[in-house]
């Protein structure tokens, strides 16, 4: 496991910001950070990007788009949900993870030798923590903003 540094925090913050973009824009920018591929996963209001290079796979969950009612509703759906992986969690965040979960897991399982990092901002930060709890020992590090 790596230690957190300012540079790593900035690196994963950039990737978290790319999760708000379309796949073409994110692909162009992620190459500047050393990633060869960006894949958009979207289902309703839930969205994330999968970035890969030779060593790593990064799942970056998109945060709240304040102009999108579904995102705002996910944020305010703050009652507790019992998760077998993470105890009690924010119900709105949990529902958003469920929307993209199968495709995220398929991408991760397709890269079994790569180190897995998870990141996200706002709603995406909450989704990141739930995903990390579900994936447990497979995760190298989680960065939330």
Predicted regions and their residues:
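Non-catalytic, mobile gating and regulatory segments of ester bond hydrolases
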Residues: 1-119, 123-145
């Amino acid at each position: 496991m790596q230690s957190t540094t300012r540079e790593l925090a900035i690196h994963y913050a950039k990737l978290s910001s790319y999760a708000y973009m379309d796949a073409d824009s994110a692909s162009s920018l992620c190459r500047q950070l050393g990633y060869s591929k960006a894949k958009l996963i979207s289902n309703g209001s839930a969205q994330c990007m999968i970035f890969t290079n030779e060593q790593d796979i990064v799942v970056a969950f998109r945060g709240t788009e304040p102009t999108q009612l579904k995102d705002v509703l996910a944020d305010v759906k703050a009652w507790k949900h019992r998760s077998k992986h993470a105890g009690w969690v924010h119900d709105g965040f949990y529902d958003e993870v469920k929307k993209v979960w199968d495709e995220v897991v398929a991408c991760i399982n397709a890269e079994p030798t790569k180190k897995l990092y998870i990141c996200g901002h706002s709603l995406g930060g909450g989704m990141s923590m739930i995903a990390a709890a579900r994936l447990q020992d497979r995760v190298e590090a989680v960065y939330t903003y």
